[in-house]
Regions:
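Domain-core and long-helix interface of multi-subunit machines
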Residues: 1-54
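Short amphipathic alpha-helical segments
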Residues: 15-16, 72-74
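Residue-level "edge-of-site" marker
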Residues: 7, 35, 63-65, 93-94
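Mid-to-C-terminal alpha-helical segments outside catalytic/metal-binding sites
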Residues: 74-101
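Short active-site-adjacent structural elements
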Residues: 37-41, 67-73, 100
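Short acidic/histidine-rich active-site segments
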Residues: 56-72
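Residue-level detector of family-conserved "landmark" positions at structurally sensitive sites
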Residues: 4, 32, 61-62, 89-91
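A general structural signal for well-ordered secondary-structure junctions
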Residues: 28, 57-58, 86
């Protein structure tokens, strides 16, 4: 199971231990790059960065729902590398390839 955008959900921000329980059961999180750069508000950004520091980001999302919005996945990987190291970014890349080869 992939949990999309938990950083944008009040429920998970207020109850991060429940997200931890789902992850322990095998769920993955999908964090929006826009949240990592603050486009989804300070609360989403702070929680996304908290998840990153805890190693709880499994995949990244671009929110590119149409052809007019360009994906910024490379920016997301750059943030992950800067804050958590290249091995964390490589782990996310590898996981994403198992979903979309």
């Amino acid at each position: 199971m992939i949990i999309p955008h938990p950083e944008r959900h009040f429920f998970f921000r207020e109850n991060p231990e429940l997200l931890d329980e789902l992850i322990a059961l095998g769920a993955w999180t999908q964090i929006s790059v826009d949240s990592l750069i603050g486009k989804n508000g300070a609360e989403a950004e702070n929680f996304a960065l908290q998840l990153l520091s805890r190693g709880s980001i499994h995949t990244l999302a671009t929110d590119a729902h149409n052809t007019k919005r360009r994906p910024n996945l490379s920016l997301g990987y750059a943030i992950v590398e800067q804050r958590a190291g290249i091995s964390a970014a490589d782990a996310i890349r590898s996981r994403m390839l198992t979903i979309v080869p």
